[in-house]
Amino acid sequence: MATELEHGLADVRMWGGTAVMDAIRMAVDHLRKGTKEKKVLLVITDGEDDSSDIQQDALLNLLQKSDVTVYAIGLLSQEPTNARKNATKLLQAVAKVSGGASYFPSTVEEVEALATQVAHDIRNQYVLEFPVPSGTKVGPHSLRVNAESKSRGKLTVRTRPGYYYQPATASPAKR
C-alpha cells in the first residue's frame, strides 16, 4: 500500500532544468532569518544542477558560515552517468560541509524510510559550544569531535568539518 509521500513523489513531474544550488541558497537565506535554533533543510532532487546562478564554491562557503544543516536525497538513477556523478558530488559536498548527510536511493519507495531516518537524526542532535581561543583569526577553522562511552566504546559522531569564526558572533562557537 503506497504512502502519502510515495503518492506525492509519484505525481512530481521531473523535467526541465535543475537549479538545486539556487534553491539551497534561497532556503538557507530564509532559514537564517528564523528564530528557531535548529535549522535543517531536506533537499530531494532528481538531477544534476544545470541552471543555478550561484557557483558551488560560493554555496559551500555560505553553508560553512550558516547554522543550517542540509540532508540531501538524490533520486539519480535515471540520470546519465556523468550527470549522476556530478549531482552525487554536489549533494555529498553540501551535506558534509553543513554537518548533514546525503542518500542515494535506487527507488522512490526508499525515500520514506530515509526521511524517517533524517527525522530521527534531527531529534537526536546536540549543539556543542566552546569558547573561541583569543587570537583566533577570522575565517574557517577545522574542528574534529570524538566521543566515547564507557559502556559502548567509541561512538559515531557526525559534525561539520569546522566552523567559521566571525568576531561579532564568535563567542561561543557552535557545533
Roles of regions detected by a PLM:
Residues 1-175:
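Scaffold/interface architecture of coatomer-like assemblies
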